[in-house]
Amino acid sequence: MAAGGGLSRSERKAAERVRRLREEQQRERLRQVSRILRKAAAERSAEEGRLLAESEDLVTELQGRSRRREGLKRRQEEVCDDPEELRRKVRELAGAVRSARHLVVYTGAGISTAASIPDYRGPNGVWTLLQKGRPVSAADLSEAEPTLTHMSITRLHEQKLVQHVVSQNCDGLHLRSGLPRTAISELHGNMYIEVCTSCIPNREYVRVFDVTERTALHRHLTGRTCHKCGTQLRDTIVHFGERGTLGQPLNWEAATEAASKADTILCLGSSLKVLKKYPRLWCMTKPPSRRPKLYIVNLQWTPKDDWAALKLHGKCDDVMQLLMNELGLEIPVYNRWQDPIFSLATPLRAGEEGSHSRKSLCRSREEAPPGDQSDPLASAPPILGGWFGRGCAKRAKRKKVA
């Protein structure tokens, strides 16, 4: 015993060795119990049966872990309604669309997978592949075009059946589908838009190329400057872990107002794992009877399934094709010559041509963008934007370190 009644150094070391030994014995017992539980009951020896009886707490813990793993696995599985069931559900959804006084659509990455832009949590999603240690790739994002779902939403808005669209997507495809900017809230930004935050109000620059080449988490300067004040421009992307503060294109004010007025919400292609964290979108302060009716289209489980009036297990394009048929509405075909981005875009100034190396959009696939001598139809390695690729790289690095 050391002076003053405390333990001596050798006594502390001995106590630490005893603690570590007990922990190792507990881990070994846990491994033994786990191996026994993997066997069928008829295959267990009498000694193994006694060990399980003496380790009720460990058995309970391991069985609980197994149930949780199975539950998570089931939630990640994609489920498809059979064709007849899906048609029945779409008829019900069509009735809800017709009778809605204020319908708001929430969209996620699942509506853009048909444009070869991967989602995040599907079987071939970004996070899913990274968790498995597999590489992530995507087609050049400048080649993506609005999907059948994007064009259907635009037609529904034209017909005043949809009042507002709230999107998590950064791909700019809602804007390019012809949806008015006042009708969109791009909560996580738009890869084609950079802004000057020194100008009041903020000055926006819509481009025909991905502006996020040099940007990443907490690094948003694009390398170009404002035509009016000369301040460095920044992208509009809200990365995971960031809080969006820009007025546009996030348009939170309109999203909140639309949600407060909504009597019906249609969620398309979103896991809702991020959107559920935005309480302003769900009117949870209202009594249950006054909350909007929720309709969800997704192949996987979502945390809002229990709140939904109807869950449709199907691909967004398939569901929207059936819905538009049921409503008797023709789906417009996307035409690059009519893409609004070309009339909204601000051209680069002299000397800015080398400020990016991304392929620019052009009205025709045969037409090479100014300064672009490459063959637009030639195959090229996939290019990931800063909003997309940098996040993938960070996740992969964390996975490798772990």
UniProtKB/Swiss-Prot annotation:
Cofactor: Zn(2+)
Protein name: NAD-dependent protein deacetylase sirtuin-7
GO MF annotations, alphabetized: chromatin binding; histone H3K18 deacetylase activity, NAD-dependent; metal ion binding; NAD+ binding; NAD-dependent protein lysine deacetylase activity; NAD-dependent protein-lysine depropionylase activity; protein methyltransferase activity; protein-glutaryllysine deglutarylase activity
The Deacetylase sirtuin-type domain, residue ranges: 83-330
Family: Belongs to the sirtuin family. Class IV subfamily.
One Pfam family in the UniProt entry: SIR2
Modified residues (Omega-N-methylarginine): R390
GO-annotated biological processes: DNA repair; DNA repair-dependent chromatin remodeling; homologous chromosome pairing at meiosis; negative regulation of gene expression, epigenetic; negative regulation of phosphatidylinositol 3-kinase/protein kinase B signal transduction; negative regulation of protein ubiquitination; negative regulation of transcription by RNA polymerase II; osteoblast differentiation
Activity regulation comment: NAD-dependent protein-lysine deacetylase and deacylase activities are activated by nucleic acids. Histone deacetylase activity is activated by DNA. Protein-lysine deacylase activity is activated by RNA. H3K18Ac histone deacetylase activity is inhibited by methylation at Arg-390. H3K18Ac histone deacetylase activity is inhibited by deubiquitination by USP7.
Cofactor note text: Binds 1 zinc ion per subunit.
Main location as per UniProt: nucleus
Active site positions, chain numbering: H188
Top class in the EC scheme: transferase
Amino-acid positions noted as binding Zn(2+) in the UniProt annotation, renumbered to this chain: C196, C199, C226, C229
Biased composition (Basic and acidic residues): 9-23
Reaction(s) catalysed by this chain's protein: N(6)-acetyl-L-lysyl-[protein] + NAD(+) + H2O = 2''-O-acetyl-ADP-D-ribose + nicotinamide + L-lysyl-[protein]; N(6)-glutaryl-L-lysyl-[protein] + NAD(+) + H2O = 2''-O-glutaryl-ADP-D-ribose + nicotinamide + L-lysyl-[protein]; N(6)-succinyl-L-lysyl-[protein] + NAD(+) + H2O = 2''-O-succinyl-ADP-D-ribose + nicotinamide + L-lysyl-[protein]; N(6)-propanoyl-L-lysyl-[protein] + NAD(+) + H2O = 3''-O-propanoyl-ADP-D-ribose + nicotinamide + L-lysyl-[protein]
Gene field: Sirt7
Subunit structure, interactors included: Interacts with UBTF and the RNA polymerase I complex. Interacts with components of the B-WICH complex, such as MYBBP1A, SMARCA5/SNF2H and BAZ1B/WSTF. Interacts with ELK4, leading to stabilization at target promoters for H3K18Ac deacetylation. Interacts with histone H2A and/or histone H2B. Interacts with DNMT1. Interacts with SIRT1.
Residues binding NAD(+), per UniProt: 108-127, 168-171, 269-271, 298-300, 316
